[in-house]
C-alpha cells in the first residue's frame, strides 16, 4: 500500500512539474509604460494597461483570458536585458510613455533594442501595441519595431465620432491565421503600419496595413497601432455584434501557440 501511495505522489508531482515547466510566461512591460494617478486620498497608483487595473483602462480581462489558457502572467518594471527576459515566452510592450504622460519617461534605447532583438531571435514572442501618433512615444518605439521590418506611421486612422461604433468596425475574413473566431472587431484611432521583409501584413483595410507579423530568427513579432484589447473593449461595453472578446481569445491562443512552437524549435 505504501508503495502504491508513494508511486501516486510521484506521478502527481511529475504532472505538476511538467505543467509548470510547459506553462507560457507572459510578461507585460511596466518600464516603458509607467503611468500613475492619485486616488481620493492622494496616494499614487500605477494605472493604464496593467494586469492589476480592473477599470476600463486596464488589462485585467486579458490577463484572465491568458490564465484560462494555462499561461502565467508577469510584469517587468525594469529595462529589458538578457537576464530580465530570461524565462519569458511572450513579452508585451504597450503604448510607451510620452512626457505628457510621465514626467521622466523611460525611452527605448539602443541597448534595449539589442537585448529584445536577440531574445526574439532565440525564440521569444514580442507583442507591440502602439497608439495613435498623438498618444504614444513613436520615435524610440520605431527603433525597436524597425529591427523586425515594421514601422508605426505618424497618423491617426479610423477615427470614431462619439458612440458611432460602426465607424470603428473592421471585418476579419474567415480562415484568418490569427483570428479564427472573431469576425467583426472594434479598433479605432490607431497608427497604421509600413512594413518590409521579414514582416508581413496579416490584416489590411484597403491599402492600409492594420496588423503585421514578423518572423525573426526563431521568434515572432505581432504589431498593431493601438492598445486595443484593454478592458473597455473586452468587457461587454461594445454592442453585441462586436467580437473583441473573441479577438482577445484568438490572439491569446495564437501567441501561446507561437511560443510553444518556438520553444520546440529551440530544443
Model-derived segments and spans:
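Bacterial Sec-dependent N-terminal signal peptides
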Residues: 1-24
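Short, surface-exposed patches at the edges or C-terminal ends of soluble domains, predominantly
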Residues: 22-267
Amino acid at each position: 500500500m505504501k508503495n502504491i501511495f508513494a508511486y501516486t505522489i510521484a506521478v502527481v508531482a511529475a504532472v505538476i512539474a511538467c505543467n509548470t515547466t510547459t506553462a507560457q510566461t507572459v510578461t507585460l512591460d511596466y518600464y516603458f509604460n509607467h503611468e500613475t494617478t492619485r486616488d481620493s486620498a492622494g496616494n499614487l497608483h500605477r494605472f493604464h494597461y496593467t494586469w492589476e487595473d480592473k477599470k476600463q483602462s486596464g488589462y485585467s480581462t486579458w490577463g484572465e483570458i491568458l490564465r484560462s489558457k494555462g499561461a502565467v502572467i508577469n510584469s517587468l518594471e525594469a529595462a529589458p536585458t538578457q537576464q530580465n527576459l530570461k524565462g519569458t515566452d511572450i513579452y508585451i510592450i504597450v503604448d510607451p510613455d510620452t512626457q505628457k504622460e510621465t514626467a521622466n519617461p523611460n525611452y527605448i534605447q539602443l541597448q534595449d533594442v539589442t537585448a529584445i532583438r536577440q531574445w526574439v531571435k532565440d525564440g521569444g514572442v514580442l507583442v507591440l501595441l502602439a497608439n495613435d501618433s498623438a498618444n504614444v512615444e513613436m520615435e524610440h518605439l520605431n527603433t525597436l519595431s524597425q529591427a523586425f521590418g515594421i514601422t508605426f506611421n505618424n497618423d491617426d486612422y479610423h477615427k470614431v465620432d462619439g458612440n458611432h461604433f460602426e465607424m470603428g468596425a473592421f471585418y476579419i475574413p474567415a480562415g484568418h491565421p490569427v483570428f479564427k473566431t472573431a469576425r467583426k472587431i472594434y479598433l479605432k484611432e490607431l497608427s497604421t503600419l509600413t512594413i518590409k521583409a521579414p514582416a508581413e501584413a496579416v490584416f489590411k483595410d484597403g491599402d492600409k496595413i492594420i496588423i503585421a507579423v514578423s518572423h525573426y530568427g526563431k521568434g515572432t513579432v505581432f504589431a498593431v497601432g493601438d492598445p486595443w484589447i484593454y478592458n473597455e473593449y473586452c468587457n461587454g461595453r461594445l454592442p453585441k455584434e462586436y467580437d473583441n472578446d473573441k479577438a482577445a481569445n484568438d490572439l491569446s491562443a495564437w501567441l501561446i501557440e507561437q511560443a510553444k512552437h518556438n520553444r520546440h524549435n529551440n530544443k
